[in-house]
Amino acid sequence: AMLDQIETEGWLRAKAVVGIWPANAVGDDVELYPSPAGAASAATAALPVAAEAAPAAEVMRRLHFLRQQADKPPGRPDFCLADFIAPRESGVRDWIGAFAVTAGLGIDAHVARFEAAHDDYSSILLKALADRLAEALAEALHERVRRELWGYAADEALDPQALIDEGYRGVRPAPGYPACPDHTEKGTLFALLDAPGNAGMALTES
């Protein structure tokens, strides 16, 4: 099976980078501030979910989010991701995390080999497997963030079905999906994480 070949012959390499930063909401935007001393962007220690502190003067980056535009019955608000971060005027220092993962390093040579042999099936299958492996890596890394790197759910013990049902604490939105439809925020995230330098990842034109 191709999945066995990927593993035994080392066709693909996986890499990931994660960052956790102080943050506050300003309207529909989220301001990110430099991490305090000892809390590097590729965090290895637990950080508080929220702590009383005066907002930092330096804004490192801004994430721009869009508010829902749906017609809803009275009493049902249109949400924005910024609603889930403490407002700057609250005086509460909140935090935000992000990560980028890939399981496709090394794939180009094998795709080219299949396409040169007019083996479209194997080319498509390899791309699909790399995509699924990246999704699995994202799931595993998100769990490690919750339990270890950020540590806000250190005692979490979810079974596979609970993970599928997203029964964990927190959310994992991604640019290009309904909660964050603006693809341009990928550039901001890649810059924050230095995804090219830390994980060998690059954004495509699409």
Question: For each of these PLM feature ranges, what is it?
Answer:
Residues 114-118, 139, 153-206:
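Activity-critical C-terminal alpha-helical subdomain
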Residues 134-147:
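Charged, low-complexity helical/coil segments in non-catalytic cytosolic or luminal regions
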Residues 1-124, 128, 146-149, 158-160, ...:
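Active-site loops and adjacent core secondary-structure elements that bind or stabilize anionic groups
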